């Protein structure tokens, strides 16, 4: 009997940029605005983030259809859990749920080609959180993270300058160093970055001007 073929998960393209940085009492999530297919920019103001609750923010990159479908699925289920149980899932439980769903899909005929960062604030333990999750359902809590081109050029900068008790101003300065490095090294216009911050007070969007030219070495 011939075995039925299943769809193999394709490696998500690295053309997008996702960055996550935690500090003393905040988590910064930054995502490139350009929606691209190959070398073509389809949209210059694409928001790759999705709020899952008041204190949890998800940023995704990957195949366009997979990211939208998976984001809506996770968003709806997290909100449904909150309505049924009258309590919000904490960031760690949400990361576990996302990892489980990716693992189930990976073993099915239609895996999701999605990489994501899950930033949040744990109101019970009073600390910021960040989870790095990839399309193979690997998940890890980390102090900083990157997906896409950012993981090739920014992790060394983050490793050098990040420490657990950085202030918000220091976190934004490190983010600026990362985006400047991307502009310096890559011949790609990401159309700027959308920056959002998660604190104990909730999620807010931070103004971030990324139009200044950077001198190449």
What are these regions (language model features)?
Residues 1-217:
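Long, low-complexity N-terminal extensions
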């Amino acid at each position: 009997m011939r075995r039925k073929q299943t769809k193999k998960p394709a490696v998500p393209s690295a053309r997008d940029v996702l960055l996550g940085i935690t500090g003393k009492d905040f988590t910064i999530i930054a995502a490139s605005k350009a929606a691209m297919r190959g070398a073509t920019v389809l949209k210059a103001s694409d928001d790759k983030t999705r709020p899952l609750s008041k204190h949890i923010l998800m940023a995704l990159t990957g195949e366009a259809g997979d990211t939208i479908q998976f984001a809506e699925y996770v968003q709806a289920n997290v909100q449904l859990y909150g309505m049924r149980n009258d309590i919000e899932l904490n960031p760690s439980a949400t990361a576990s749920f996302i990892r489980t769903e990716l693992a189930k899909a990976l073993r099915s005929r239609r895996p999701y080609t999605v990489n994501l960062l899950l930033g949040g604030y744990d109101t019970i333990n009073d600390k910021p959180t960040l989870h790095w999750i990839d399309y193979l359902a690997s998940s890890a809590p980390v102090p900083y993270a990157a997906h896409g081109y950012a993981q090739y050029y920014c992790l060394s900068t983050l490793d050098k300058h990040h420490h657990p008790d950085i202030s918000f101003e220091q976190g934004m300065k490190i983010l600026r160093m990362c985006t400047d490095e991307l502009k310096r090294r890559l011949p790609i216009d990401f159309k700027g970055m959308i920056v959002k911050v998660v604190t104990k007070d909730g999620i807010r969007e931070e103004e971030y001007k990324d139009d200044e030219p950077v001198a190449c070495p």
